[in-house]
Each structure stands twice: as C-alpha cells, then as structure tokens.
C-alpha cells in the first residue's frame, strides 16, 4: 500500500509497511481517508532529526481520541532517512501523530521504541524544506 502526502511544500510518496505493521498502517490510512490530516500542521520540526505532524490541536497534545498499540518487533524498525514513524507519549499511546526522519544520525535510539510504518520513496527533498507551521494539505491512500 502507498500514500501520497501533499504539503504546501510539495508531495511525498510513501511506501507503507502494511505487511509488517498492519494495525498502525490501518489506523493511519483510516484517518487519512476520513480527511483527519487535511489542513493540520507540522507542529514540531527539529533540523537533522525529524518533522512531526498529525496533531489536531497543532501543539503536540492532541490525537484522535483513542490509542493504538506499538508494533515494534517487525523487521523494518530502523529510523533511517525518510522513515515514517508513530509518535507517542509512551508505549501504546500513539494515535494520529507521526514523524518523518531527516537522517539516521540522530534517530537510532528510537529503534524498537516507536513504530516505523512507512518510508518516503519519492519527494524526499520535501522533508528538508518543511518548517514549523507548514501544512499537510491532504493524504491520499493508493491501494
């Protein structure tokens, strides 16, 4: 399964790890299909680390109103450049917030802690142009 993340800075094409992290991918795609992410901002941007979005409050404090379990035992659980991962406040507290890694340099400590559920395969340059407050225009799921 694939996703197209349309932002005000360009489009990122993402391969989703639906075989490895089925519950996380289902949650993400369900929210995307409902338009949950449309118009939300990247509220947290840390250079050489990651860009984070998916908070309906725009502050990092919101979510969809429920939590999902982590799926961190799959094979593709390395936070490399372009990897899409679920943000959370502790084990099994993810919901809608996600982050995309800038590089492997500062992310190894996240392996096995946060669920990696996809990777940007095209439009990787967009990651580097995103700034705090930039918008997710829409996320299109391609099955």
Which residue ranges define each predicted feature?
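Cyclophilin-like peptidyl-prolyl cis-trans isomerases
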Residues: 1-143
């Amino acid at each position: 399964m694939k996703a197209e993340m349309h932002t005000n800075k360009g489009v990122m094409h993402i391969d989703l790890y639906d075989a490895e992290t089925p519950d996380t991918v289902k949650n993400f795609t369900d929210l995307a299909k409902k338009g949950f992410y449309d118009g939300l901002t990247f509220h947290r941007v840390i250079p050489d680390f990651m860009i984070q979005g998916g908070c309906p409050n725009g502050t990092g404090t919101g979510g969809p109103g429920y939590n999902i379990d982590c799926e961190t035992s799959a094979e593709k659980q390395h936070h490399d450049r372009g990897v899409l991962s679920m943000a959370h406040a502790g084990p099994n507290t993810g919901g809608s917030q996600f982050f995309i890694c800038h590089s492997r340099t500062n992310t190894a400590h996240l392996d096995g802690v946060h669920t990696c559920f996809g990777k940007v395969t095209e439009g990787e340059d967009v990651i580097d142009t995103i700034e705090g407050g930039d918008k997710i225009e829409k996320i299109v799921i391609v099955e």
